[in-house]
């Protein structure tokens, strides 16, 4: 579950903090209110593409951090394999952009953008207007079902339906 977003020096945002509630969270607002910038900051923290032009004009860097709480065994196993410490089931994704450089961190440990993307794909799936590609992937359907039941379906069932 996504718990918190922290953004600093990104586009028009000097600094912002958002706490998320359990369940569905919806960003709404007038045109130009900053919804796209917030989604962009999440994308940045998740390892997505971001332009250095997004760094606030009066700043040297932009920072985006997301805090998640998870008990998903496959995610915790992968973090253990990567030697990323996890306390209280919290996973903190952080990305700092300065000039042409990008520094990614998972729970304070420096990682590559590829690793950040791998872990983030196990934590969240962001869908904007007309963005639903992962829902078209049949393999993703089983992951979604497994996440709701907190069990992994028998591989034979998976093969029969994919």
Where are these regions (language model features)?
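Gly/Lys-enriched N-terminal cap/neck module of very large, oligomeric protein machines
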Residues: 4-7, 11-144, 151-159
